[in-house]
Amino acid sequence: MSCPRLVIAGTSSGAGKTSLTLGLTAALRRRGLKVQTFKVGPDFLDPTWLSLASERPCINLDGWMCGERYVRDRFATATADADIAIVEGVMGLFDGADPAAAAGSTAEIARWLDAPVLLVVNAHGMARSLAALVKGYAEFDPDLHLAGVIANRCGSTRHGDWLSEALCAAGMPPLTGTVIRDSLPPLPSRHLGLVTADRQHLTSEALNTLADAVERQLDMPRILDLAEKVPATPGVAATASSTEGRPVRIGMAFDEAFHFYYPDNLQALEDAGATLVRFSPMHDDTLPADLDALLLGGGYPEEYADTLETNQTMRQAVADFAAADRPIYAECGGLMYLSEGIELRDGSRHAMTGALPFATRMLATRKRLGYAEVRHLAHGPFGPAGTCLRGHEFHYSEAIAEPAAPGWQSAWQVSYRRSNKPVAEGYQRGRLFASYVHTHFASRPGAARAFVDFCRGES
């Protein structure tokens, strides 16, 4: 890994790291650099913004789900043709899957990648206290290279000068940016976080505005110098792809309502011999021809419930596919689409495919957020009973009633990071498998190959 690189971390969520990462990415691209972006953690939303800003797929780096070997190798392969890598952190620098360890944190990823860290701090109302705060972050993990500080929401450039002097006097990393309050345009959000980025939300004009703000307020020469002073850490040899067996065509739901997929999962499926055929449950009349299986990812079906309900021919096509016991794998929003209907917060109900014998409803408060380790209770898409993967849940919906129809069973035994008691989760009958857990195939070697075999009907 000889690519210049930086990790943009925050003292907490809301420090401003996403806006600054977008602006920095846009500013670097204006300088003619190929920028490869990464996002620490399991998030699906921030990567859509970073992908638009870089015009390259943003890759999730998750220490808890994927492990060090995979993270280092994935970084090396993704940056092979890049000029610089920008890694956006998650939550605060040391926040992750374990309150007493670094697992799943930005700090863990920064150490694995030997990457310098720029710490974004909300400096509103702070002076010398900023130096004390930074000192705590700098000394909390002596193996971490905290290379610079970006003071966000400053009152003035004079305020920034004061902060810079305070850091210098305390022997702390230098101030590499003074960002004046309200100088960065706000990013739109909804209940799961940021909205999914598209050119309506992140126009070229908006990117230029962010880039201008970064160029004006960050010490770009110093930041580039920090990015280049990194060791050449060897990556891990990539695993050869395996495409034995007959070709498989997997219909993948992809539109405004369904788009929560880890790029690495999709690449792994293609490497294992699958052809992914995109279709839109919102806009297409029916399923593509000659499909072996369906992949229904997460997203925002509740936001487009009326359009999904109106597309009766597509709903019937998916219901018929399920009734024929063809392989279907659904996660979160995909589960909701397979249900009898979605009940919105206003009490209205919209019909879905009815492949699952219950409806779902939106809640005013979050149902679940966190990491999950899952285990097949019976033979499933990833192998025999007992097969384990890791994943993540984040949703505001729930099943209104558990299935009473014969033949249905729970899909997973789930162990949540914040609970010592495993629970049954998801729904399985025949070759239909639906769950609220977003799994990452890198958490189990051979998972993608097993999934493709499942779609072929060979497992």
From Swiss-Prot:
One annotated GO molecular function: cobyrinic acid a,c-diamide synthase activity
Site (Increases nucleophilicity of active site Cys): 438
A biological process term (GO) from this entry: cobalamin biosynthetic process
Keywords: ATP-binding, Cobalamin biosynthesis, Glutamine amidotransferase, Ligase, Magnesium, Nucleotide-binding
Cofactor: Mg(2+)
EC number: 6.3.5.11
Pathway of action: Cofactor biosynthesis; adenosylcobalamin biosynthesis; cob(II)yrinate a,c-diamide from sirohydrochlorin (anaerobic route): step 10/10
Catalytic activity: cob(II)yrinate + 2 L-glutamine + 2 ATP + 2 H2O = cob(II)yrinate a,c diamide + 2 L-glutamate + 2 ADP + 2 phosphate + 2 H(+)
Record-linked Pfam families: CbiA (PF01656), GATase_3 (PF07685)
Disulfide bridges in this chain: none
Annotated active site: 332
Domain annotation GATase cobBQ-type: ranges: 249-446
Gene3D superfamilies: 3.40.50.880, P-loop containing nucleotide triphosphate hydrolases
Cross-referenced PANTHER family: COBYRINATE A,C-DIAMIDE SYNTHASE (PTHR43873:SF1)
Function: Catalyzes the ATP-dependent amidation of the two carboxylate groups at positions a and c of cobyrinate, using either L-glutamine or ammonia as the nitrogen source.
Record family assignment: Belongs to the CobB/CbiA family.
Domain notes: Comprises of two domains. The C-terminal domain contains the binding site for glutamine and catalyzes the hydrolysis of this substrate to glutamate and ammonia. The N-terminal domain is anticipated to bind ATP and cobyrinate and catalyzes the ultimate synthesis of the diamide product. The ammonia produced via the glutaminase domain is probably translocated to the adjacent domain via a molecular tunnel, where it reacts with an activated intermediate.
Note: The a and c carboxylates of cobyrinate are activated for nucleophilic attack via formation of a phosphorylated intermediate by ATP. CbiA catalyzes first the amidation of the c-carboxylate, and then that of the a-carboxylate.
Protein name (Swiss-Prot/TrEMBL): Cobyrinate a,c-diamide synthase
Species in which this protein is naturally found: Syntrophotalea carbinolica (strain DSM 2380 / NBRC 103641 / GraBd1)
